[in-house]
From Swiss-Prot:
Residues 185-255 are annotated as: Small ATPAse domain (RuvB-S). The gene is ruvB. One of its GO terms (biological process) is DNA recombination. ATP binds at residues 23-24, 65, 68-70, 131-133, 174, 184, 221. One of its GO terms (molecular function) is four-way junction DNA binding. It comes from Histophilus somni (strain 2336). Homohexamer. Forms an RuvA(8)-RuvB(12)-Holliday junction (HJ) complex. HJ DNA is sandwiched between 2 RuvA tetramers; dsDNA enters through RuvA and exits via RuvB. An RuvB hexamer assembles on each DNA strand where it exits the tetramer. Each RuvB hexamer is contacted by two RuvA subunits (via domain III) on 2 adjacent RuvB subunits; this complex drives branch migration. In the full resolvosome a probable DNA-RuvA(4)-RuvB(12)-RuvC(2) complex forms which resolves the HJ. Residues 4-184 are annotated as: Large ATPase domain (RuvB-L). The RuvA-RuvB-RuvC complex processes Holliday junction (HJ) DNA during genetic recombination and DNA repair, while the RuvA-RuvB complex plays an important role in the rescue of blocked DNA replication forks via replication fork reversal (RFR). RuvA specifically binds to HJ cruciform DNA, conferring on it an open structure. The RuvB hexamer acts as an ATP-dependent pump, pulling dsDNA into and through the RuvAB complex. RuvB forms 2 homohexamers on either side of HJ DNA bound by 1 or 2 RuvA tetramers; 4 subunits per hexamer contact DNA at a time. Belongs to the RuvB family. This is Holliday junction branch migration complex subunit RuvB.
C-alpha cells in the first residue's frame, strides 16, 4: 500500500519512533495544543493524587499521529508511576494479559495501543480487572477445571484507538475518562516544530517553522517528520540553518505543497477535475483512472481530503469542491 512510503502519512514509521521518543514532552506543562484535554487531565490527575487513588481508566481516541501515546506517557509521568506498554494485536492469549496485570504496582499505568483490536477472550479478562481490580483465572482442564480470583492492585488502563466506534459497548463503558484528540492548528504545529528543533539542537527561523507547520496536515507526527527531512536539506545546502527559503526549497523537493498534498493527493483530485469534469465519479472508475486500489482511495487518500473540504462523497460518487478548483487555480465548471 502506498501509505507506507508517503512522507505525509500519519501512520508511524520505524524511523519515527527513535526521534519521537527523544522529542516527546514528558509533562502536561510541555504539552502543546489540545487545550481542553490538557485542562481536564490536569484536574483529573491532581484530584487522583490528592486522594492517593489510581487515575480512572482513560480512553484516548482520534486520527493517527496526534499524540495518543505521548499523552499516555505524560499521564504516567504526572502520576509518578510506571507505565507498561502493549498493543491489541500483541495480546493473543489471556495469559499474556494476566502476566502484565499481575506485575503491576499500585497505581501503575497499563497502556494498550490499538485497543479496538483486542480479541473477545482478552476483553473478558479485562472486564473484572477494570471494574473490580480482580483477575479470574481458570486452573486445570476439563471437568477438573476451576476458577480462582486474584486481587490486583489499583491500576489505570489507558486505551488508545483510531476507531472508537469499533470498541464493544461493555469495554467502552468501563472507561471513566474519554478524551478525543483533534487535528492541530497551524499555530500549535509551528510551536511543536520550534520545540522539536530545540530538542534536536537545530537552528530554525520562525517563518521556517510556519512553512513546515502549514504543510503538516494538522498532525504533529508529520510535522516532526518534515522537520527532519528539511534538516537534511539544510545540512547540505545551508550549513544546517533552516530559513524560510530553505524550508520552501526542501518541501518543494519533497513534493509537498501548501495544503500538505503530495503527488497522490493531487493525482486523485486532478483526475476528478480533468477526466470526470469535477464529478460525480464512482469509486471503481476513479480507481481505474489513477491506477490505485479502491481500499487505498477510501482508507488512505480520501479521509484528509474530505476532512479539509476538498472532496465530497455523495450517493452518485465523488465530487471535487470549489476549494479544490481554487487550490489548483482553476475555474469551476458550471453545471
Amino acid at each position: 500500500m502506498i501509505e507506507v512510503d508517503r512522507i505525509v502519512s500519519a501512520n508511524a514509521k520505524v524511523d519515527d519512533e527513535y526521534i519521537d521518543r527523544a522529542i516527546r514532552p514528558k509533562l502536561l506543562s510541555d504539552y502543546i495544543g489540545q487545550p481542553q484535554v490538557r485542562e481536564q487531565m490536569e484536574i483529573f490527575i491532581q484530584a487522583a493524587k490528592l486522594r492517593q487513588d489510581a487515575l480512572d481508566h482513560l480512553l484516548i481516541f482520534g486520527p493517527p499521529g496526534l499524540g495518543k501515546t505521548t499523552l499516555a506517557n505524560i499521564v504516567a509521568n504526572e502520576m509518578g508511576v510506571n507505565i507498561r506498554t502493549t498493543s491489541g494485536p500483541v495480546l493473543e492469549k489471556a495469559g499474556d494479559l494476566a502476566a502484565m496485570l499481575t506485575n503491576l504496582e499500585p497505581h501503575d499505568v497499563l497502556f494498550i495501543d490499538e485497543i479496538h483490536r483486542l480479541s473477545p477472550a482478552i476483553e473478558e479478562v479485562l472486564y473484572p480487572a477494570m471494574e473490580d481490580y480482580q483477575l479470574d483465572i481458570m486452573i486445570g482442564e476439563g471437568p477438573a477445571a476451576r476458577s480462582i480470583k486474584l486481587d490486583l492492585p489499583p491500576f489505570t488502563l489507558i486505551g488508545a484507538t483510531t476507531r472508537a466506534g469499533s470498541l464493544t459497548s461493555p469495554l467502552r463503558d468501563r472507561f471513566g475518562i474519554v478524551q478525543r484528540l483533534e487535528f492541530y492548528s497551524v499555530e500549535d504545529l509551528a510551536s511543536i516544530v520550534t520545540r522539536s528543533a530545540v530538542c534536536l539542537q537545530l537552528e530554525i527561523d520562525v517563518e521556517a517553522g510556519q512553512e513546515i507547520a502549514c504543510r503538516s496536515r494538522g498532525t504533529p507526527r508529520i510535522a516532526n517528520r518534515l522537520l527532519r527531512r528539511v534538516r537534511d536539506y539544510a545540512d547540505v545546502k545551508n550549513g544546517g540553518k533552516i530559513t524560510a527559503l530553505i524550508a520552501q526549497e526542501a518541501l518543494k523537493m519533497l513534493d509537498v505543497d501548501l495544503a500538505g498534498f503530495d503527488f497522490m493527493d493531487r493525482k486523485l483530485l486532478q483526475a476528478i477535475i480533468e477526466r470526470f469534469d469535477g464529478g460525480p465519479v464512482g469509486l471503481d472508475n476513479l480507481a481505474a483512472a489513477i491506477g490505485e486500489e479502491r481500499d487505498t482511495i477510501e482508507d488512505v487518500l480520501e479521509p484528509y481530503l474530505i476532512q479539509q473540504g476538498f472532496l465530497q462523497r455523495t450517493p452518485r460518487g465523488r465530487i471535487a469542491t470549489s476549494r479544490t478548483y481554487r487550490h489548483f487555480g482553476l475555474e469551476q465548471i458550471e453545471k
